[in-house]
Amino acid sequence: MKTTIAEVNQYVGQEVTIGAWLANKRSSGKIAFLQLRDGTGFIQGVVEKANVSEEVFQRAKTLTQETSLYVTGTVRVDERSPFGYELSVTNIQVINEAVDYPITPKEHGVEFLMDHRHLWLRSRRQHAIMKIRNELIRATYEFFNERGFVKVDAPILTGSAPEGTTELFHTKYFDEDAYLSQSGQLYMEAAAMALGKVFSFGPTFRAEKSKTRRHLIEFWMIEPEMAFYEFEDNLRLQEEYVSYLVQSVLSRCQLELGRLGRDVTKLELVKPPFPRLTYDEAIKLLHDKGFTDIEWGDDFGAPHETAIAESFDKPVFITHYPTSLKPFYMQPDPNRPDVVLCADLIAPEGYGEIIGGSERIHDYELLKQRLEEHHLPLEAYEWYLDLRKYGSVPHSGFGLGLERTVAWICGVEHVRETIPFPRLLNRLYP
């Protein structure tokens, strides 16, 4: 019976065949222990000299790391194993022998591992991170589908910059200038006027010359946009969504969290409501903590976000930023036009901003004024202005950065481990 490691619990006491790679091995006299992986999980294969032919036993002792195999054996319960089962091996068939696999069980430097990212993905740690990333994506689709959202795909090539910045990757679109997308938000606003509640999930590109542990050049964003949602509606949805993601990982990825050594007691606290600070209150909190390098009107850096997060055991909203700090499309607070109806959600434990969101301007004249204040060409945004001319309504949305969210939930220090093939300031390979 051919099966996978994830399904061996269905075949206890039965003989099965698994296609796998040899992650590691050790031998002791008349017994060999094979650490096998097949993508669905890890299992130990036990080869006892008394139970196999001499040829099979010698083959087991000489197998090299990452050799691909068909391994046949009887499934046994093993309470000592994190997985709960082991394979009592009866036969081994080599598919392809791996010679001089570069990533040995010893410690390796980060640059070496990044040069071999295509192989580093095979490790237990990276396997766990990718499985948790996948669970966040699965849970995202489940969350929004259950709430009546429609998945809409935004273009990667655009003729304008949603944030109105210069941090763009430029390319030629035949005879026109084009840019790699920084966000699908503007297109989601158009889609929300047609479909009510929508979300996009795709790659975004920022030509930021940042080398911090929080920054990637290419990263993935989940961007919902909702017609008839005002500021408070938006915050409640964000709380619900982030809590849903965390609880899904806690319930479905226990093995992976354990493999990463993640303290799940901190994640168990992530349930609505989340604490809130206005920008004004956040500035005061930082001053009270002794920060002298920030005043009203300044944006927060990583040390500031970390200091704010340390005051709470859940993600915290920072709301009502100065209008001057935020993009042109954010709705000013009607009671105080110098701030906008926006919020950044700061993750605990120093992982920084994972969500940025706001209520959007829905008045044509105000949006046009804001575009002019930001010195953006009106002709490039004519279609976006049209949304305010033809049945505009209050609407809101947000963007969640997948990689920072993965880093926080997994408890990994750097976002380079949270995406299969990271694109960094100094890295475009492999």
Curated annotation (Swiss-Prot):
Say yes or no: keyword Signal present: no
The reaction(s) annotated as catalysed by this protein in its Swiss-Prot or TrEMBL entry are: tRNA(Asn) + L-asparagine + ATP = L-asparaginyl-tRNA(Asn) + AMP + diphosphate + H(+)
Pfam families found in the cross-reference section: tRNA-synt_2, tRNA_anti-codon
- The record's EC number reads 6.1.1.22
Instruction: From the Swiss-Prot or TrEMBL record, state where the protein is found.
Output: Cytoplasm
| GO cellular component terms listed in the entry, alphabetical order | cytoplasm
Any idea which UniProt keywords this protein has? Answer: Aminoacyl-tRNA synthetase, ATP-binding, Cytoplasm, Ligase, Nucleotide-binding, Protein biosynthesis
Single GO MF annotation: catalytic activity, acting on a protein
Q: Which PROSITE patterns match?
A: AA_TRNA_LIGASE_II
Out of the domains of life, which is the source?
Answer: Bacteria
Keyword Nucleotide-binding in the entry? The reply is: yes
CDD domains in alphabetical order: AsnRS_cyto_like_N, AsxRS_core
A Gene Ontology annotation in the biological process aspect, one of them, is: asparaginyl-tRNA aminoacylation
- Record-linked InterPro entries: Aa-tRNA-synt_II, aa-tRNA-synth_II, aa-tRNA-synth_II/BPL/LPL, Asn-tRNA-ligase, Asp/Asn-tRNA-synth_IIb, NA-bd_OB-fold, NA-bd_OB_tRNA
Q: How does it assemble?
A: Homodimer.
Name the family: Belongs to the class-II aminoacyl-tRNA synthetase family.
This chain belongs to the protein called Asparagine--tRNA ligase
Task: Provide the species name.
Answer: Geobacillus thermodenitrificans (strain NG80-2)
Name the encoding gene, please: asnS
